[in-house]
Regions:
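Walker A (P-loop) phosphate-binding motif
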Residues: 1-22
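General beta-strand structural signal in soluble alpha/beta enzymes
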Residues: 4, 27-32, 63-66, 91-95, ...
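N-terminal phosphate/diphosphate-binding loop that engages ATP/GTP or pyrophosphate donors
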Residues: 18-71
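Loop/turn-to-beta-strand initiation segments
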Residues: 58-62, 86-91, 119
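Conserved catalytic-core segment of NTP-binding enzymes
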Residues: 71-87, 96-196, 211-212
């Protein structure tokens, strides 16, 4: 089970991973918080493993979740995560929210990572670097506090790395929207400053490279 946290791009990364893994395996996607109902795979709203198994007979990728009060969104499945972990070859969980902003800091109750998750991938949008903390970050006051900068200061690679290091929430960092020479330079700088493996690229273009 892999949990995906961080800034904007989580749903896109989840789909990219699901599409790749589905070439040779069954993949279950879900959320531990809220996510938009995917239109690219069957959605099981019945909280039963039998319903998930039936869906896998029709598609290698299945989404499981319950309808919530927000139109067009799903909540977590009505099943124990341990049971879900055994329902597919791979389970991908969107475990965070960022209000479509490229970067974020996490409050005490975030992210909502299932205890049985074996890997946590954090998404950071390189387009947030250079913007002010107040404009680029979800929970900007907390981000500024962890980075040791004013909330109106620009986000630098050093500030981003400081927040990621202080939180210590992820196993792998994925830097998204790296689509120019300048963006690659910034991504490489972030990779130099963090202690975890780093993959960077553009989900939109289907390009990526391992930087660390």
């Amino acid at each position: 089970m892999t949990a995906i946290i961080g800034g904007g791009g989580k749903s896109t990364l989840l789909r990219a991973l699901a599409d790749a893994l589905a070439q040779h395996a069954h993949v279950l996607v879900a959320t531990s918080t809220k996510m938009y109902v995917p239109d690219w795979c069957p959605v099981v709203r019945d909280a039963s493993l039998a319903a998930v198994e039936r869906a896998f007979a029709e598609s290698p990728v299945v989404c499981a979740g319950l309808l919530c009060e927000l139109p067009g969104k799903l909540a977590a499945p009505g099943l124990a995560w341990e049971a879900i972990a055994g329902a597919a070859d791979y389970v991908l969980v969107e475990a965070d929210g960022s209000r479509h902003l490229p970067l974020k800091a996490h409050a005490a109750h975030e992210p909502v990572v299932p205890a049985c998750a074996s890997r946590v991938v954090c998404v950071a949008g390189i387009d947030g670097v250079g913007e002010s903390v107040s404009q680029a970050c979800h929970r900007p006051q907390l981000f500024a506090q962890l980075a040791g900068v004013p909330v109106e200061a620009p986000v630098t690679p050093e500030a981003l790395a400081a927040v990621l290091g202080a939180e210590g929430l992820h196993d792998i960092l994925y830097i998204n929207k790296v689509e120019s020479a300048e963006a690659w330079q910034l991504a490489r700088r972030v990779a130099q400053l963090v202690a975890t493996p780093v993959v960077a690229g553009s989900l939109r273009r289907g390009e990526f490279a391992c930087l660390r």
